[in-house]
């Protein structure tokens, strides 16, 4: 068997990646009135290896909703991406020659290449299956866009023996109907929806017109037939060397009907691009399928799967194809350090469109599309063709989004991190096969289903000293994502991020920090119980006031709270009161901070409510000093040149999943059998402890020394923050010293 596209011998035994994990969400799914909406919840446990009492559970909520009830009936125009070079391999050509010999001379059939294109049918099949999952409705009208009743079919039984089917005909031979009537009938309906010129060997003549009479199917039978037909068409296109075009068309169809709510606003730009994909009319001969091309596609082991089980399969597929956007971020290199792709501009938006951001997004999309298509092929179990056109088709769709007549709200900001649609953690049982430059740099998934993942608790850091109630560290920060310990502090009661601050350095050296309105608010009574704004407590400038605070995903966005220079962080260990009482805050010890964190997923479940994820985080997306720093490093006179954003020369295909830790070596993946049982919180030190000391000695100890500050730079290429020119404040914004909030 060969894995070469369009080889003479068709390689069988391919296995889509959705087969192993689909049993996770086994709770009953609901249909609410005329709209379909579901929320899936994954619980991920983070636990310190140095102290098992330092642990917390984080939740990821994936929300799917029906785009609109008539989305599946979207008008087919026949315009779009054209594919004219997909020819069958010899093994299929030999089968097809037997069909044509009945209608053409043997010599003509033997010397003819047989081409096929069912991309439009695959896109509509994806739309139909998504519609069924969200509404529970599927019938002949949906599959054919109400065109099957009036469709005239060309019959070949009475044709001239020397006649030959035109290149544009969709030929459904009788051999296929005898072999698999389910596939035959669904192909006919999908061909009707896509205005194909359908030809058959012989059918009944009704009222003087050749029309095909469909046998009866109930919805359960029809859904199974559609499921099997999808993989039949994928197999045909993959055997011709165009499997990547096929899986892209199918993915576009799935997301044309369902809306996966993004975990970041601009991350949904990929959804917009997928919806712009369209294809020309289908054609080709549909041969009897070669047995075993795909393995285990009938994961329900029944020909009439229950709607609840069937929806679970394809809900997962929809989520997984959206999560691949995160894994496919090509990244960017700043001072030899890889960061998530972040685009910045000081150009203002005009009529809801920022042309500079759109241009930068298109440049980054060139590399993103190549990686995304490669990962999509791996997920579906088809061969990625290095000479294929799928990435160019997707790139063209991005261009339509960026340059279309209608403004796109995802492109109207001054700072954006485009390649993060939804969180990918816990959605796959194996990430190592994917091509993911962003994961190799440590911004990828933080949990693998069915295994434990060991991560460094914090990014490379240096302990710089203690003074009074505090201990200080110098972090090679990069982003919040690089510090899994903060996931524990954010979700653990009693010693959270409110005891961590950045007061040793200015507060304006951040990109994409959260809750900016709090720090810039000047409302009457701000920070008091009588405030006219929503800020009833005073600003503390602690870490919890800089994060996004998203309720749909407890994990930090890969680009959340980005810094391109080192950061000094204070951890408050004690709370000293005026009367001499000292409360132990139970802040993580140095061993915990410098140690490791083990993560595991306890499963995915389907919820019946989305009330807990209605909050939308507030994120600063204006051009600030750190954005100026990024552009200076990108387009300045540095030796690293344009590879920071434009070339990506320093980011390449890698096999390891996470960046090596300077203290502990390569972070291993530890496999376990079956599900890990959830840990029980055993800490007995949650209650505040009080110790009586001499207030005078406490004051003297606090004032005796200043916390030492480690040097900010590790390279002569990295200037201090003072060397970076600040942008001029916008009209109505505070001046210097107020940060980018």
UniProtKB/Swiss-Prot annotation:
GO cellular component: T=2 icosahedral viral capsid
Keywords noted in UniProt: Capsid protein, T=2 icosahedral capsid protein, Virion
Keyword ATP-binding: no
Lineage of producing organism: Viruses, Riboviria, Orthornavirae, Duplornaviricota, Chrymotiviricetes
Pfam families with a match to the protein in the record: Totivirus_coat
Top-rank lineage group of the source organism: Viruses
Entries under InterPro entries matching the protein: Totivirus_coat (IPR008871)
Record family assignment: Belongs to the totivirus major capsid protein family.
Name of this protein: Major capsid protein
Region (Disordered): 716-741
Function: Capsid protein self-assembles to form an icosahedral capsid with a T=2 symmetry, 35 nm in diameter, and consisting of 60 capsid proteins asymmetric dimers. The capsid encapsulates the genomic dsRNA and the polymerase and remains intact following cell entry to protect the dsRNA from degradation and to prevent unfavorable antiviral responses in the host cell during all the replication cycle of the virus. Nascent transcripts are transcribed within the structural confines of the virion and are extruded into the cytoplasm.
Location(s), subcellular: Virion
